[in-house]
C-alpha cells in the first residue's frame, strides 16, 4: 500500500509530461496550416490588386483627357438664355397647376364652352412658349472646348429642361451649307449649330472648323460630258 501511494504522484507527473509532449507535437501541423494560408492569401489578393490598378489607370486617362480640354469659345447670351428658359418653364408649371382652377371658373361663368376656351388659351401659352424658345435656342452653342491630344472639339448646347448636351466632332465632320438657314453656322452629323465668330478666343479655330484653311473649290465642271458632246455634234 505504501508503494502504491508513492507511485501515484509520479504517475500524475508522467501524465502531465505526456500531455505537454503531445501539445508540442501538434504545433508543427498548425504552423503548416498558417504558412499555407499565408501563401494562399497573397495569391488571392493579386487579381484584386490588378483590378484596382486597372481602374486607377483608366481613371487617370479620363482625368488627363478632361484636363486637356481648353475652352476656346463662350457664348455671351448663354446666361440670359438660361434665365429666359427657366422663367418659361416655371410659368408653364404654374399654368399646368392653374388648369383645374380655369376649368372650374369657366364652368361657373359660361358653361362647357367657356371652360374649353380658357383651358385652350392657357394650354397654348403653357406648352407652345417653351417649345418655341427651345426651337430658337437649341442651335446656340454656349461653350466650345478643344482637346489638343485628340484634336477634337466639344460643343455644348442646352436642352429643353436646361440640361447640357455635348457634341464631339472633328473638322472633317463639319459641313458648311451653301445657303445657311436661320441661326445655323455649320452642320455636325446633320445637326445644325450656331456660333458667333467674334467670340472665339483664337480665330484660327473658327477658320479650322469652317474649313477656310482648305483650298477654295469654285465648283467648275471641267470633266467632259459625253451627252453634251453628242448633242453638239448632232446640231452641227
Swiss-Prot record:
It is a multi-pass membrane protein. One of its GO terms (biological process) is mitochondrial proton-transporting ATP synthase complex assembly. The chain crosses the membrane at residues 83-103, 116-136. One of its GO terms (cellular component) is mitochondrial inner membrane. Keywords: Membrane, Mitochondrion, Transit peptide, Transmembrane, Transmembrane helix. Its main location: mitochondrion. Residues 1-64 form a transit peptide. Disulfide bonds: none annotated. It is found in: Mitochondrion membrane. Associates with mitochondrial complex I assembly intermediates during its biogenesis. PANTHER family: TRANSMEMBRANE PROTEIN 70, MITOCHONDRIAL. Belongs to the TMEM70 family. Scaffold protein that participates in the c-ring assembly of mitochondrial ATP synthase (F(1)F(0) ATP synthase or complex V). Also binds the mitochondrial proton-transporting ATP synthase complex I and may play a role in the stability of its membrane-bound subassemblies. This is Transmembrane protein 70 homolog, mitochondrial. It comes from Drosophila melanogaster (Fruit fly).
